Design a protein with these regions (language model features):
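Positively charged n-region of N-terminal signal peptides that target proteins for export
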Residues: 1-4
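Bacterial N-terminal signal peptides
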Residues: 7-17
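Electrostatic cytochrome c docking/interface patches
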Residues: 16-31, 42, 47
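Gly/Gly-Pro-rich "capping" loops immediately C-terminal to redox-active cysteine motifs
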Residues: 29, 45-80
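The canonical Cys-X-X-Cys-His
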Residues: 32-42, 90
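Sec/Tat-exported extracytoplasmic proteins
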Residues: 40-43, 58, 74-78, 94-98, ...
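Mid-chain, structured segments of secreted extracytoplasmic proteins
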Residues: 65-105
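Flexible coil segments in periplasmic/lumen-exposed cytochrome c-class electron-transfer proteins
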Residues: 85, 96-135
Length: 135
């Protein structure tokens, strides 16, 4: 009986560890580390002037249709292999985790991600400069 209880405890602990590892690997933070940190850095400060900070004023991006469209189409977002739901969670996590301004924004949706994936961005620096020129 003791062996059975011990074996059950060991198996339960192993399954718990495996499931928590699987959850961790699908978290928005994990996706950020895989697909965004190379350009935007661990703390979201980016590599100005070419790669913008995620900590600075993103209001022009999260607050306008053109800006949201831009965020949905940047190479790291459009190229992320996760589901549309996971990518929407990633974008929302980025805004909530790094942006230091007003967080009154409409969360990104999986439907927006799917639309963004239909139109890949070929020159993100050029498109960002064009977008900023309009503000």
């Amino acid at each position: 009986m003791r062996r059975f209880l011990l074996a059950t405890a060991v198996v339960s602990a192993a399954l718990s560890l495996l499931s928590s590892a699987a959850v961790g690997q699908s978290s928005p933070h994990f996706f950020f580390l895989q697909f965004c940190v190379g350009c935007h850095q661990y703390d979201g400060t980016g590599l100005p002037p070419d790669v913008p900070s995620l900590r600075d004023d993103l209001s022009y991006l999260i607050g306008s249709p053109e800006g949201r469209d831009f965020m949905l189409r940047v190479p790291g977002v459009i190229g992320a292999p996760g589901s549309a739901e996971q990518v929407a969670e990633l974008l929302n996590w980025i805004v909530e985790s790094f942006y230091q301004g007003d967080l009154d924004f409409t969360p990104f949706t999986p439907a927006e991600v799917l639309l963004g994936r239909e139109r890949p961005m070929h020159d993100p620096i050029k498109e960002r400069l064009e977008l900023l020129a309009g503000f």
